[in-house]
Structure formats: structure tokens, C-alpha cells
Amino acid sequence: MNKQQQTALNMSRFIKSQSLTLLEKLDALDADEQATMCERLHELAEELQNSIQTHFEAQYGIGVEQP
């Protein structure tokens, strides 16, 4: 995997991680509507990360290392 592809995968992991952190903060603030939106954002971030990883694995025929 080249550097740009690794960067894209790392960015997707970061977005997933940060959306979960935001969800926890919104839950603590009892911001239910926003927490629901953020939960969907986190689910989409997870789907995106999995899609990117699968794409690169298929492209190169190798596994992508997990951090």
C-alpha cells in the first residue's frame, strides 16, 4: 500500500474514533437528537473505514494492517 492509501485509511480510522468520542460527549450532555445523528455518523465512518480497507485489500491482494 502506498503512502496516500495509508493516509486515507488512517484518516478514516481517525474520523471513526472522533465520532465515537463526540457521541460520548453528547450522551453526557443529554443532547439526544444530536447523539442520534452522531451515532449514525459513527456507523457511516465505520462503514467507510471497512470499505476503504476492503478496496485496498482487493486491489493488492494482501491484508491491511490494523493499528
What are these regions (language model features)?
Residues 3, 11-65:
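Short, charge-rich amphipathic interface segments used for partner binding and complex assembly
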